[in-house]
A protein has these predicted regions:
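Radical SAM enzyme core and accessory elements
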Residues: 1-4, 10, 283-473
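Short, structured beta-strand/loop micro-motifs enriched in basic residues and often containing a Trp
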Residues: 7-16, 36-39
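Conserved PDZ fold ligand-binding element
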Residues: 20-40
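PDZ-domain C-terminal substructure recognizer with occasional recognition of PDZ-binding tails
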Residues: 46-82
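Conserved Radical SAM active-site core
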Residues: 64, 72-218, 228-258
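Structural preference for beta-strand elements that scaffold enzyme active sites
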Residues: 150-152, 188-190, 221-223, 271-273, ...
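Hydrophobic anchor at the start of a short beta-strand
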Residues: 189, 219-220, 371, 444
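Flexible glycine/acidic-rich beta-alpha junction loops that bind and position SAM and/or redox cofactors
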Residues: 199, 219-247, 267-290, 378-384, ...
Length: 473
């Protein structure tokens, strides 16, 4: 095994009292092989570690090596956690999609922002959506043999010529063959269609949904997502696309509702779902949480607002059953200003602001807090980008500065953590939360973007203000 391969097999943690712990494997060791064969990736490892008898080759940090014969119960795990979850390089995207958001990014951002992953294995590990265009048949068959489900697929169109055109990839036209093969292995499918007006909507959308319906019970969900366009697009001479307007958004909703009725009658499930942005663009009411049947594609903005609203009501209902919990929090918050009146601003994308404002009435009623939801225009990517998750630090800070200059400024600003890079305290434009706090004249609280996370942040406000007071002294 070469050094490039070995770097993916570094052991990060050994579970206490596990087999690996008992035989002396330690963090920093490298799993070189199992039964003399190198490890292809984490799926290869997971399958082979389940054998009742196996020999593992270990390379130690001091340059020595050892080989250990292990006899154990079949299906018992070794207890090794690797530094690299995938245990291999992540496959990059081989497409040049006409709607690709990464191609519309400005220059000068962090290099990781420009990496386009399209790795089926990441679909299983992290729920990523993949196009299945960069896999040889042998590798596709290997991954299907693990029978991992569901498979999240970026379909966009099922007509071969149209899919090839949209993805600029000659291998993109065989999507239905691959989906049928996956379904034959008992694997469920979540499909995503990024819709571009005049390109893959209208009769092409009907054709795509009709084709996908052939997958039967294994078709779990089909998400219809509007194309996202930034202000940098025109300067790049990219394929000419336009955003959805009210009329075209309503046309897509009508198609979706027609198929929902069809699937409800045939399978007892709606299957086809729309991103919240379609309802907002159309000026129509977003359905209730029960409409989404389990929220299969929240990461695509499908049912996100209904989900957060339901979570918020659930979090408050749970506290109401404790009787004193809300009253105590309300009393502590009232004491923060001395006047009994406390005001918070909640940062949001422009699209969601009105819907979030309606949900926040339960905060006013139960906690006595005045809530102002601030829809922040996206100057960084362009005003056609209206979702909260694509707000940058500089645009949020600009909005906070405006709030601070008001005659009666709010007491604290709440920022959802969906605006941060996953697992980091960094916004998309590389501004850190610490940078923002140091430049803001208003207190800032970053909260977990769930109903429970929001209520927990409210409950913790007295502690935050108390800590800030001590630091100022």
């Amino acid at each position: 095994m070469d050094n490039k391969s070995l770097k993916h097999s570094v052991i990060f943690r050994v579970e206490p009292d596990s087999i690996a712990d008992e035989i002396g494997i330690r963090p920093g060791d490298i799993l070189a092989d199992i039964d003399g064969l190198p490890i292809r990736d984490v799926f290869d490892y997971r399958l082979r570690e389940l054998a009742a008898t196996l020999s593992v080759g270990i390379l130690h940090p001091d340059g020595t090596s050892s080989e250990v014969l292990i006899e154990k119960d079949e299906d018992e795990e070794l207890g090794i956690v690797f530094q690299d979850d995938l245990m291999d390089d992540c496959r990059s995207c081989s497409n040049k999609c006409v709607f690709c958001f990464v191609d519309q990014l400005p220059e000068g951002m962090r290099s990781t922002m420009y990496f386009k992953d399209d790795d089926l294995r990441m679909s299983y590990l992290n729920g990523n959506f993949v196009t299945l265009t960069n896999l040889k048949e042998e590798e596709f068959d290997r991954l299907l043999s693990y029978h991992l489900s569901p498979l999240n697929v970026s379909v966009h169109a099922t007509e071969p010529e149209l899919r090839v055109k949209m993805m600029n990839n000659q291998f993109a036209g065989h999507i239905m063959e691959r989906l049928r093969k996956a379904v034959a292995c008992g694997i469920d499918i979540n499909a995503q269609l990024v819709l571009c007006p005049g390109l893959n909507d209208g009769p092409h959308l009907d054709k795509s949904i009709d084709d996908l319906s052939e997958l039967g019970e294994h078709l779990v969900s089909v998400a219809l997502v509007p194309v996202g366009l930034t202000r940098f697009r025109d300067a790049r001479s990219l394929y000419p696309l336009r955003p959805f307007d009210q009329e075209s958004a309503r046309e897509v909703i009508a198609v979706a509702e027609r198929y929902q009725k069809f699937f409800l009658k045939k399978f007892g499930r709606r299957i086809v779902f729309l991103a919240d942005e379609f309802y907002i663009r159309a000026g129509m009411t977003i359905p209730r949480a029960s409409h989404y049947e389990g929220f299969y594609q929240l990461e695509n903005g499908v049912g996100l607002l209904a989900c957060r609203r339901a979570e918020l009501f659930h979090a408050i209902s749970k506290r109401k059953r404790r009787k004193t919990h809300i009253a105590e929090t309300r009393e502590h918050i009232s004491a923060l200003t001395g006047t009994g009146e406390f005001r918070i601003a909640v940062i949001s994308g422009v699209d969601a602001a009105n819907y979030i404002s309606e949900s926040m009435m339960c905060i006013v009623d139960n906690y006595g807090i005045n809530v102002e939801v601030v829809g922040v225009p996206n100057d960084f990517f362009g005003h056609s980008v209206t979702v909260t998750g694509l707000l940058t630090g500089q645009d949020i800070l600009k909005a906070i500065s405006g709030l601070a200059e008001m005659p009666n400024p709010v007491d604290v600003v709440f920022i959802p953590d969906v605006t941060l890079r996953s697992g980091e305290d960094v916004f998309l434009d590389d501004m850190t939360v610490r940078d923002m706090v140091s430049q803001s004249t208003l207190p800032i609280i970053v909260y977990e973007t769930t109903g429970e996370g929001f209520i927990s942040a409210i409950e913790n406000m007295p502690n935050v203000f108390s800590q800030n007071s001590r630091e100022e002294r």
